[in-house]
Amino acid sequence: MGIEMAMVRPPRCLLVNVTTGESMECLFNPTQLTEKVQVNYSRLAVPGLSHQVLQFQSTGNRQLSGVEFYLDRFFATEQPGEPDILDFHAFLRALTVPPEGTEGVVDTAPPRTLLIWPDVITVETVVTDVEFQYRQVAVDGTVLVYAATVTFEEILDARVTSEALREEV
């Protein structure tokens, strides 16, 4: 591997609002990713038995918790197009509320989010939690550096089997 490879920008994580088609590329890729799946069992107490019988109920949705997106105004000004770091803030906030003009229980949910991180993960989710931490603010109140910590939960529209998961790469 030559020095030219050191200058190649790695693929960036991308978030897509499935409802509007709007997408936002991450300024930096998250430094870590925690994936959690919960398996739910009913605990059946049988009189006289020394233990509880576990009966499978369901598998919970895959969760990606505490995904941290770091945004730095100084770094952003050096990028093509000089992205405004607060646009990412507005994009994430828009993923937490229903879109305008929706009516009815089914439609009045926040939009789904497609999380695409090349060679790592691609998953359709909803945002279940967002926390913004403003780490550096200028004297005039301009946000210079902040982190957005997001929890995503996978949305599945079809039954998943263990065989199908074994085939995923």
Q: For each of these PLM feature ranges, what is it?
A:
Residues 1-169:
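Acidic, Ser/Thr- and Gly-enriched intrinsically disordered low-complexity segments
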